[in-house]
């Protein structure tokens, strides 16, 4: 097994000016040596429907499942809607977790989020963590990255202006790297 750690970044927002997608872009520039981040595109994943699933996985779902299988770790960026993760993210997780095999099982993960509110996606992250634990994903506990007042933390081009948030993302990536190595044995 290679020492390089391949991380799959998954944004729970489809919005073109998404603060969460911007945070993932920022993370790409902050990865420690020996780590890389590839971004998943979940925009083509249809709403989960058992009738469609009975016919097989749609191509966008199969691509997403393959990206999960190929990754050493996962980095989720979720907005918060109504005290929870975004529906589009939950939908992608629901599709990817269907049998016969479970691509999420045993994967280390980290969660970050950005929100215009003052709690910075705290509730969404805890809800996402609960879902991931059920899927046998191993979420990193600390540091937590919850970017509040995102409209002030990012500029119009999506660059993160908040030095503390940038430092937390960098620390989280370093901790994720150590977590992956620890779980590898």
Curated annotation (Swiss-Prot):
CC cofactor: FMN
Keywords assigned: Flavoprotein, FMN, NAD, NADP, Nucleotide-binding, Oxidoreductase
Main EC class the enzyme belongs to: oxidoreductase
Binding site for NAD(+): 115-122
Highest taxon above the source species: Bacteria
InterPro entries: Flavoprotein-like_sf, FMN_Rdtase-like_dom, NAD(P)H-dep_reductase
GO cellular component: cytosol
Binding site for FMN: 13-20, 81-83
MF annotations from Gene Ontology: FMN binding; FMN reductase (NADPH) activity; identical protein binding; NAD(P)H dehydrogenase (quinone) activity; oxidoreductase activity, acting on NAD(P)H, quinone or similar compound as acceptor; protein homodimerization activity
Subunit (UniProt): Homodimer.
Similarity comment text for this entry: Belongs to the SsuE family.
Enzyme Commission number: 1.-.-.-
UniProt protein name: NAD(P)H-dependent FMN reductase PA1204
One protein family per Pfam: FMN_red
Function: Has NAD(P)H-dependent FMN reductase activity.
Species of origin: Pseudomonas aeruginosa (strain ATCC 15692 / DSM 22644 / CIP 104116 / JCM 14847 / LMG 12228 / 1C / PRS 101 / PAO1)
Gene3D superfamilies from the UniProt entry: 3.40.50.360
């Amino acid at each position: 097994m290679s020492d390089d750690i391949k991380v799959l970044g998954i944004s729970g927002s489809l919005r073109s000016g998404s603060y969460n997608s911007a945070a993932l872009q920022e993370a790409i520039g902050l990865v420690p040596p020996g780590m890389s981040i590839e971004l998943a595109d979940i925009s083509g994943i249809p709403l989960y429907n058992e009738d469609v699933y009975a016919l097989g996985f749609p191509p966008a779902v199969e691509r997403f499942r393959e990206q999960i299988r190929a990754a050493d770790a996962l980095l989720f960026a979720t907005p918060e809607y109504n005290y929870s993760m975004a529906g589009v993210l939950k939908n992608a997780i629901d599709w990817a977790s269907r049998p016969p095999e479970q691509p999420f099982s045993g994967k280390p993960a980290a969660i970050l989020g950005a929100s215009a509110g003052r709690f910075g996606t705290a509730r969404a992250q805890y809800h996402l963590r609960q879902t991931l634990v059920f899927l046998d994903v191993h979420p990193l506990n600390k540091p937590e990255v919850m970017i509040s007042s995102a409209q002030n933390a990012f500029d119009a081009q999506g660059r993160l202006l908040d030095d503390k948030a940038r430092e937390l993302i960098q620390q989280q990536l370093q901790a994720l790297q150590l977590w992956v190595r620890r779980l590898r044995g």
